[in-house]
Regions:
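Periplasmic-binding protein-like
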Residues: 305-350, 397-398, 510-515
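Aromatic- and charge-enriched surface segment that lines or borders ligand/interaction sites
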Residues: 76-132, 166, 256, 308-310
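Gly/Pro-rich hinge or "lid" segments in bacterial periplasmic/extracellular proteins
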Residues: 60-65, 138-147, 151-158, 162-164, ...
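Structural transition elements
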Residues: 208, 322, 335-377, 395-397
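Extracellular/periplasmic solute-recognition and catalytic clefts
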Residues: 211-222, 243-306
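N-terminal lobe/hinge region of extracytoplasmic solute-binding protein
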Residues: 4-10, 27-83, 201-203
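Long beta-strand-rich cores associated with HINT superfamily self-processing modules
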Residues: 526-553
Length: 553
């Protein structure tokens, strides 16, 4: 694509402006996974959280490499550690208030962290903090089941005064500032907490609060009158309202964004294949489109807990039978869809090493002879039946292409389309559902929780991060002591070169299990309304940073 305005928002701010007012009109085919900062994991839900909630740290509001930095948000400075990452100290800003006027203090941040431990009540969000802060000899059950005298809470987090936080970790962790940029560090007042019901009306500490929420239909955010711009170094808060329309089909979303009825597709998975072709042929549409490298991996998860995938030969048969070229074309091809992937770590991370454990033949269309040999080794020369889980839109196209390519060797995959909003909480992300519904294969994707190898790979393959209660992303429930040990070794390696080499080993060790079929290192084609201002693709999320956007029309 040669249009000079195409991809303009990938590296710079398009239409910079300080104009305030108006309504930012967003649209999505699916509802948020949760409005509770402890329970959300969808990347676009995190971008909404940036408008509603303050966190201890936050990704910088910048395009390009600068946006990958985490900067102080509620904190006045990055965390300090006197002992190499074992203890972390933060001082919080004064003058920050919840929407009801209550001051935000360290106690409410500590309580927010404690809520993460209540996985029986609040599953769904990231759980790094549990592994770093919990005492295995005396596990903390979360604030709802803390029966100890005086309910002392999580002892590993101290609040010596209202504006000081001290975290005492079980092991050194150099990336702790990144964890403090996740929604799980957004403060929650204990008196406002309603447990599982908090997601219906969380209390805002950021520039916008909920004005109206009709699940599956509409979310309207209005200004938070208690927000003080002078205390917030991250957020622009230009529009008076942010209005999110929910529940259109992916094709309806495309049509109405292209027609100018909405400003962007909040979900951010990119336009459908028909719209890609339309944009490519229309210079006016191309000039307001962006096709960033997202650092996401599009992949097929293969579940060993669902027979016959408990046999590695059946898993390998899927790898060899898959038509990699057709799967890439289902994502939009090499122009808009991304690049063929062989390993797990995307090229933007130092641990990436080109590696193809299961070659797909000279034309990339699959090695059917090797696939049949693997089926024979499993004692299933005629193939078998299974279910492939997916969502609507491009995920469905991928599932259909996968099923067609596997059928060439006798693997009969029935496509099951699951609800998008609950896909990772109660569908593919709930181990019991995977077993009950026999979801042997699943179409999914993953981007790093933060831009390091640990932030990318650990949730997918570290057995200690499996979440039986939902919100699980280690879909294969891989718990290999060697993989876990390599992860720990990589985290404690002394030099960047050592770390990168060890992460490459993790990648290879996981591929030996054949539980992940990498498809595409992702590119996503986004479209923006010409009436929006301050628009850029945030490099940490791969989507437009809605907290920065304004409107001028």
């Amino acid at each position: 694509m040669t249009d000079p305005l195409f991809n303009a928002a990938c590296a710079a701010v398009v239409r910079p402006s300080g104009q305030r007012g108006g309504v930012l009109r967003l649209v999505t085919s699916a509802d948020v996974d949760s409005l509770d900062p402890a329970r959300t994991y969808y990347v676009w839900s995190w971008l909404l959280q940036r408008t509603m909630q303050r966190t201890v740290m936050a990704f910088a509001a910048s395009p390009g490499p600068a946006g990958l930095r985490v900067v102080p948000d509620l904190a006045v400075a990055p965390g300090s550690t006197p002992d190499g990452g074992l203890t972390w100290h933060y001082t919080l800003r004064r003058g920050v208030r919840f929407e009801d006027g209550t001051p935000v203090t360290a106690h409410q941040v500590k309580y927010a962290v404690e809520r993460v431990f209540a996985q029986d009540v609040l599953p769904g969000g990231p759980t790094y903090l549990i592994g770093l802060l919990d005492d295995p000899a005396d596990p903390y059950p979360g604030p709802y089941r803390d029966a100890r005298p005086g309910r002392p809470g999580l002892r590993a987090v101290e609040t010596p005064d209202p504006y000081t936080l001290v975290f005492r970790l079980r092991r050194p962790f150099a990336d702790f500032d990144y964890l403090m940029a996740q929604p799980t560090s957004a403060p929650v007042p204990p008196g406002a907490d309603t447990g599982a019901g908090y997601e219906r009306r969380p209390l805002a500490s950021g520039p916008y609060r909920i004005g109206e929420y009709r699940p599956g239909r509409r979310l309207r955010l209005v200004r938070n009158p208690a927000w003080d711009r002078s205390t917030d170094p991250v957020r622009s808060a230009l529009p008076d309202e942010i209005d999110v329309t929910v529940g259109l089909t992916p094709h309806e979303v495309d049509a109405r964004v292209l027609a100018g009825e909405f400003d962007i597709n909040l979900e951010g998975r990119g336009v459908q294949l028909e719209s890609q072709r339309r944009i490519a042929a229309d210079p006016a549409l191309l000039a307001r489109s962006d096709n960033p490298v997202t650092n996401f991996l599009q992949y097929i998860s293969i579940q060993p807990q669902v027979p016959p995938f408990d046999d590695v030969h059946c898993r390998r048969a899927v790898h060899y039978a898959a038509d990699r070229v057709a799967l890439l074309e289902a994502r939009g091809g090499g122009v808009f869809g991304g690049d063929l992937a062989a390993g797990l770590l995307p090229p933007g991370l130092p641990g990436h090493r080109p590696y193809d454990r299961y070659p797909a033949g000279p034309d990339g269309r699959g090695d059917l002879a090797r696939a049949r040999a693997e089926l024979a080794a499993a004692g299933l020369p005629d193939g078998f039946e299974t279910v492939v889980a997916t969502q609507r839109g491009k995920f469905r196209v991928v599932a259909d292409v996968l099923a067609h390519s596997l059928a060439r060797v006798g693997i009969r995959a029935r496509v099951a389309e699951l609800d998008i909003a609950g896909y990772y909480r109660t569908g593919l992300g709930l181990p019991a559902t995977v077993r009950e519904r026999g979801l042997g294969l699943a179409v999914t994707d993953w981007g790093p929780d933060y831009p390091t190898e640990y932030g990318f790979l650990a949730p997918l393959v570290d057995g200690r991060l499996i979440k039986p209660g939902g919100g699980n992303h280690n879909f294969a429930e891989l718990d290999d002591p060697r993989v876990n040990a390599l992860i720990d070794a990589a985290q404690s390696a002394g030099t960047a070169q050592e770390r990168a080499g060890l992460w490459a080993e993790v990648d290879r060790a996981v591929m030996e299990h054949a539980v992940i079929l990498p498809m595409v290192y992702d590119r996503t084609l986004h479209v923006r309304n010409p009436g929006v201002t301050n628009v850029y693709v945030h490099p940490a999320f791969g989507l437009y940073d809605i907290q920065a956007m304004g409107v001028a029309r």
